[in-house]
Every structure is written in structure tokens, then in C-alpha cells.
């Protein structure tokens, strides 16, 4: 096992990794930007290193600064968390070439799965169902592009091969708009991701977003930890997640989970990963794989009892998975609300000083957050300041616990989206379960009328 790990991230996930290290008796070195000098995990750290100014490009995305911090503190491994450099194959490669262990998959796996075209091809080879679309990257010839769209059937969606997080995509309803949409997406993809390649998929009208969590070690052992329903989204950004997914037959989940495990073994994947699917009319369609820990990992932890971050560290240290598929049992229901420092309905970021913070408590309530009273939320990063997660024996009990937890939560001094969550937890359709990925945006536009 490692003696010292450097945590190359910030916010609640930095604190989450720090906690996992403590439990394993590992020293955690925290890195921070000048804007995060007063972060809770920095104050709690045995060792902390400032890696640059507030701007992410000069700190959390600054590879030489992070690797230097690992060198001066004698760390053995680097945990990238999520976001920032977590899915950057070049960073993983530089970490390993510098003599450190990257807590995540190999650079090759990140490269394959990070490019949406090669990921889709790898999944087709492994027998994982994919959204109908172009075989690979779209050609330059407009005639061929039109032919592919005709075969797939309108509406189609044009996606950037190097995209992610809901960026770099365009829905096309008619042939007249097709070529222009492809050209614009290519130009955007080149500017945003350094890769102008785009591909085409059938645009599903009312899908749900269902994802399968996997864990694998380097000895070709792999398990899936059930599913999560992340359909409550706004602009492709998840707002509420839950596990298990309401109303999907277990047999279907088992079948798709087993295919994900087979795919992981086929590509020699190690660590934690998530297969994201669109689910419509009883069918699963692969869209992408995330080669890192996800924001919403706690809902899976609560229903399976598996500590995903701890297991990530253990398999990176060369240990075997400490459980088999048969030992993974899902119990009860978990729901997570992402708490963002923003206007609850206009979504304008709301950085500033928190004058009062009171976290909820009680049976089955977990709060993952790095904030505290008098903490200053910097304007430089993502607006998420924490997550409230609940577990109950049934979905109804989990909903009741979340309603209570949200009523107990106090955040003063800044705006948060807690009022939005309070409304959604008593929304009739959400309470029934099984809403699609467009539901929240439709709900918001209806509310604004």
C-alpha cells in the first residue's frame, strides 16, 4: 500500500479523497491554488502545497506544478479526482513517466475511451449496444454525410469526438440544416477540444440517462456496482442522481452490467469507471465512458456498501478487488442532490462569503461538502459546493429523508439551488420516478411562464 498520495484536485472531491487516505493510514498531500488557501482540506492537511494562482490553467491544470509538488513531498501516487486532469491521457502518462502511480486507468485506456469514436468502436467489438449512427468519424464529403443521415434517420445529433460534459453537440432535424451543423460543430470541437473530428448518432426523443459503475483491478477481475439514474439534467449537467433506477427490470440491468464487465476485461481496464447509456423503450444505447470517479459515486456507495474511492486506491496499489460480483448486493434506495452556489432558477453563479452553514443530519443522511461558516466561495471554479445524499429502505423513504434534509439545510450569504431541490422533491412526476432527460428543462420553462 502507498504511504503518501498527492490529491490533484479541489473542493468536495479533494476532501473525499483525503478521508479515504486517512482510513487507509496513508498521508495525503493536498495541492491548492491561491484562491483555495483557506479550504477545509488544506487546513486539515498534514502537507499542503500551493501550485499557482487562482486560474485553473495556472494551477489545477498545470501539469509541471502538480508533478513538482509530488516530487518535493515524496508522494508515491497521484489521485486526479474528477474534472481538471482526471481524463487527460497525457497527464496520466507524464505522472507514470515521472515515477508515480496514477490512480486511475492506464493512459492507453483513457485515450481509447476519451475519444468518443474509438470508444464506440471498442464497445461495438465488446458487444455493448450503441446508439445507431456513423461507423466512425464523419467524412468531409457532403454527399456521404447526407447519405449517412438518411440511413440513420432524422433527427440526428452531431457530436465532437473529443467532447464531453454536454459540450460539442448539435441536434439536426432536417437535411437542409445538416451540412452547416456539421461544419459548425467541427469548428467548435477544434477550438474547444483540439480535435475537430465529429460523428453522427440517431437523436433519441425521450431517453433516460442510466449509467453503470464498474471497478476493475490489473488481474482482469471486474465487477459492476449496479446502476444510477441521472436523468434530472439541465443543459446536459446532472442535478439529481439516484440508485437504483426506478422501474427498470433487474434482468435488463444485469444483462447490461455483465456486458460492461466483459468490455472492461477486453480492453484491460483498471480502476473505477462508468458506462453512460441512453435508455428508451426497454433498450440501452452506449454513449460514453468516464474513466474516473464520478461526482455521483456516493449513491452507489450507499446502496452497495462499497467504498469506491478506497477501492480505487487499493487497486492502483496493485491489490486485487476485495470482493466478487456475487458479493455485491444492492440494498434500499439512495438519492443525491448537487448543491450549487447559484441562483436556483436563473442559474447565475453566486460566489461570495458563506455567513451561515448548517448541514442536515439524521438516519441515512450523508453530506459531502468542503464548505464551512465564513468560507469564501471563489468565482474561479465550478459552482458546486457540496452534495446531500440520503439512503432509505425504499425510494419513498429516501424521498422523505431528502425532503427533511433539504428543509434542515441552511446556507446564508450566497444563493444556492436548494429551493429548486425542495420543489423537485415534491414534484408529482419525479416522485413517481422514471422522468426522461428533458423533463427538468421542460419543468423549468413551464415554471417560468
Language-model features: where?
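ATP-binding N-terminal substructure of ATP-dependent carboxylate-amine bond-forming enzymes
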Residues: 1-126, 138-147, 397
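Conserved beta3 strand of the protein kinase N-lobe
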Residues: 133-134
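ATP-dependent carboxylate activation and anion-phosphoryl transfer catalytic cores
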Residues: 7-23, 48, 71-73, 96, ...
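Acidic/histidine-enriched active-site and ligand-binding environments that engage anionic O-linkages
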Residues: 148-157
Amino acid at each position: 500500500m502507498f504511504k503518501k498520495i498527492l490529491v490533484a484536485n479541489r473542493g468536495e472531491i479533494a476532501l473525499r479523497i483525503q478521508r479515504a487516505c486517512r482510513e487507509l493510514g496513508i498521508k495525503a498531500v493536498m495541492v491548492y491554488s491561491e484562491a483555495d488557501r483557506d479550504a477545509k482540506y488544506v487546513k486539515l492537511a498534514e502537507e499542503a502545497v500551493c501550485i499557482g494562482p487562482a486560474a485553473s490553467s495556472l494551477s489545477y491544470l498545470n501539469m509541471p506544478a502538480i508533478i513538482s509538488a509530488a516530487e518535493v513531498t515524496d508522494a508515491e501516487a497521484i489521485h486526479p479526482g474528477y474534472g481538471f486532469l482526471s481524463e487527460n491521457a497525457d497527464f496520466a502518462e507524464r505522472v507514470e513517466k515521472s515515477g508515480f502511480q496514477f490512480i486511475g486507468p492506464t493512459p492507453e485506456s483513457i485515450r481509447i475511451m476519451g475519444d468518443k469514436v474509438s470508444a464506440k468502436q471498442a464497445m461495438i467489438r465488446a458487444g455493448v449496444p450503441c446508439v445507431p449512427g456513423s461507423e466512425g468519424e464523419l467524412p468531409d464529403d457532403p454527399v456521404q454525410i447526407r447519405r449517412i443521415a438518411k440511413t440513420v434517420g432524422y433527427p440526428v445529433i452531431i457530436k465532437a469526438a473529443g467532447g464531453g460534459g454536454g459540450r460539442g453537440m448539435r441536434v439536426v432535424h432536417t437535411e437542409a440544416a445538416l451540412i452547416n451543423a456539421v461544419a459548425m460543430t467541427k469548428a467548435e470541437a477544434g477550438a474547444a477540444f483540439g480535435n475537430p473530428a465529429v460523428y453522427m448518432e440517431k437523436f433519441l426523443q425521450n431517453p433516460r440517462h442510466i449509467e453503470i459503475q464498474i471497478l476493475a483491478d490489473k488481474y482482469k477481475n471486474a465487477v459492476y456496482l449496479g446502476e444510477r439514474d441521472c436523468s434530472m439534467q439541465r443543459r446536459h449537467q446532472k442535478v439529481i442522481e439516484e440508485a437504483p433506477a426506478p422501474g427498470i427490470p433487474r434482468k435488463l440491468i444485469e444483462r447490461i452490467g455483465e456486458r460492461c464487465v466483459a468490455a472492461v476485461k477486453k480492453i484491460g481496464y483498471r480502476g473505477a469507471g462508468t458506462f453512460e447509456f441512453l435508455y428508451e423503450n426497454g433498450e440501452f444505447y452506449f454513449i460514453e465512458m468516464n474513466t474516473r470517479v464520478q461526482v455521483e459515486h456516493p449513491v452507489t456507495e450507499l446502496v452497495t456498501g462499497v467504498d469506491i474511492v478506497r477501492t480505487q486506491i487499493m487497486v492502483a496499489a496493485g491489490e486485487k478487488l476485495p470482493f466478487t460480483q456475487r458479493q455485491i448486493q444492492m440494498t434500499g434506495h439512495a438519492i443525491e442532490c448537487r448543491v450549487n452556489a447559484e441562483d436556483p432558477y436563473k442559474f447565475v453563479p453566486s460566489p461570495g462569503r458563506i455567513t451561515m452553514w448548517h448541514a442536515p443530519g439524521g438516519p441515512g443522511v450523508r453530506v459531502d461538502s468542503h464548505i464551512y461558516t465564513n468560507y469564501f466561495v471563489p468565482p474561479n471554479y465550478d459552482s458546486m459546493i457540496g452534495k446531500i445524499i440520503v439512503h432509505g429502505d425504499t425510494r419513498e423513504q429516501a424521498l422523505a429523508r431528502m425532503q427533511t434534509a433539504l428543509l434542515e439545510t441552511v446556507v446564508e450569504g450566497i444563493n444556492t439551488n436548494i429551493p429548486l431541490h425542495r420543489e423537485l422533491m415534491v414534484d408529482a412526476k419525479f416522485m413517481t420516478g422514471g422522468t426522461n432527460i428533458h423533463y427538468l428543462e421542460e419543468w423549468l420553462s413551464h415554471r417560468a411562464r
